Every structure is written in structure tokens, then in C-alpha cells.
Amino acid sequence: ELALLVASESTPEVIKSISKNRRNELIKAKSKENFIEIKQVYNALQQAYKTAFSTKVKLKVFDHIHGSREVEMTPMDSIRYHAMLLQTGLIAIDPHNGYVKCWNGGLDFDYFKYDHVTSRRSIGSTAKPFLYTVAMTEKGIKPCDEFQDIPYSILPGEANFKNKEPWNPQNATKINTTLMYNLYHGLLYSKNSITVKLLKEIGSVEPLRDLLDKLGISKNEKLPNGRLAVPQLPSIALGAVDISLLQLTAAYATFANNGIYTVPVLIKRIKDKEGKVIYEAKQQVTKAIDPLYNAIMLDMLINNETGEFSMHLK
């Protein structure tokens, strides 16, 4: 809090009036009298900042049409205004060669320097198609096989799972219908219960981690805090992994490329001033998913959009 005593060019005059030496004396003070004086100064600073943030001034704010526009509002209102803007990123990748066609990290770099394409976050239910793929390839589960929509748990010591506490996920609606769902419907309605049941059938998270690794999401990559980006925990089946939109999009592009993962390419080639090619990207591919199961999974994803089953399943 005492850091507020440090003035800047934009600090109100009442704050600037406190000399640097006097601020240092107050910070070092230990007596009760000086503490009271510090508190008085602190309260004065709080009031000064409150006044400054509540006073209308001319400033520039982001504008969707013109990029920016001048307005007269309080600094606090400008914060509220920018907080109301939808922040998102967009990336488009050609699934056949990995060429990045579009990269939009946010609204405007001048105002928002946070890149939503490279920033990491939990991916939620977008992880489910990967788990469904593993269930089919590793355990031979068929898309027509049905499972009941009831609560499922994974307990410590169960099968080859490594969770130390019981894992009892719920559906997003917190309701279980007790009805039977095949894989198509389980994915269509994004049933957490069906996903957990499939994971229990697999008996370990390692096959899922292995698939993600083939899809460019390294199972051994560690975050700055030392944790694995793809933990060895059952919760990864429901998207508890920290990856970027770039990684997720490249992984999904595999479904549109007959199960072949292609490393994203940002730069195709570089030429020197004389036109000589000094760098040319080489396509890096991995056969990640069996073509048959990839075709089934692709059909499920298309069904999620159209609501129709091309394989005539009911």
C-alpha cells in the first residue's frame, strides 16, 4: 500500500506535493505518532486517487469501426467500457499442409496486447473427441455401443489411475437422465457421465495422453509453475489441460486430414534481396489416428453441427 506514495507524471498535485525524502521518512517510521501521520497521508492518497478516477477527462478508447475514438469520460468508466468488449482469438489452419491462413490474437494490439491464440487455458469439452477416439481405437468400443447416463466415479487406486482423491464429476446440467446414450448422442449432448464411463473402460489416462502427444500437445511439457500441461489425472478427459488455441486447432485439423497430424506452418519460405530462397518450410506430419476411426470421429463432429447421422444411426 505504501507503494502508492510513489508519484508519477500523471499523479494529482496533492500526491506530488509529498516530497521524496518525506515519503522515505514516513516509510521508515516506527513510532505511533509517525504511524498516525502515515495513515493520514495514505487516506489522503486514497481520496486523491478516487477523485482522479472519478473525474471526466478527454481520452481515447477502442472503437470497432474506427479503431479508436476520443471521448470524455472518467478513467473508471473507460475501464468498465473496455471490460464489456468481447475478447477472443481466431486462427485458421489448412489441415492438409498445416499452413496458417489466419491469426487474429485479439481486437486491437494497441489496446489489448494479450494474444488469445498463444495464451493457455483449459479446453473443457473440446477434449471429449480425443477421449472418444481413444475409446474406439484402444478398447474397440463401437459408435453404436450404449452407456447409461448415471453418475460415475474414479476412486484412488482404481485400475491404472493416479488420482489421490475420489473424482466425481457431474454433467453440466447437474442432472442424470438414466437413459442410454451411444457415442454419437453422448458427444452430441456433451454428457460428462458418458465420457467418464469411457475413461473407466479404458482404465488409464496414458492412452489419451499418448494420443494428445501425437497431435502436437506434448504430454511431457511443463508449465512455468512446474506442473504438467497435460496432467496424469482423469480430469484431462473433461478438458483440464492448459494448452493454446493454436495447439487445439492443429489437433482438430487432424480429423479433417484423415488422421494425419501436420505441424502448423507460419512461414512458407524466406528470400533474400536477390530473390534467393534461404529458408523453406518442410512439412512435418505424424500418423496419429487410424483412418477408419478417424472417419467415424469426423462423422460425429459433423453430426454435432448438423444434428444428422451420415451413418444412419438412431
Pin down the residues of each PLM region.
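A penicillin-recognizing enzyme superfamily signal
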Residues: 1-94, 103-104, 109-117, 127, ...
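Structural recognition of the beta-strand scaffold that forms the well-ordered cores
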Residues: 89-93, 101-103, 146-148, 185, ...
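Conserved catalytic neighborhood of penicillin-recognizing serine enzymes
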Residues: 141-208, 261, 273-298, 302-303
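Secondary-structure transition/capping motifs at alpha-helix termini
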Residues: 95, 109-111, 137-145, 218-222, ...
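Secondary-structure capping and boundary motifs in well-ordered enzyme cores
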Residues: 92, 119-127, 175, 179, ...
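Solvent-exposed loop/turn segments at secondary-structure junctions
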Residues: 96-97, 107-110, 122, 152-155, ...
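Active-site SXXK
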Residues: 97-98, 120-149, 186, 251-255, ...
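Mid-domain, small-residue-enriched loop/turn segments at the edges of structured enzyme/sensor domains
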Residues: 161-169, 202-250, 259, 263-266
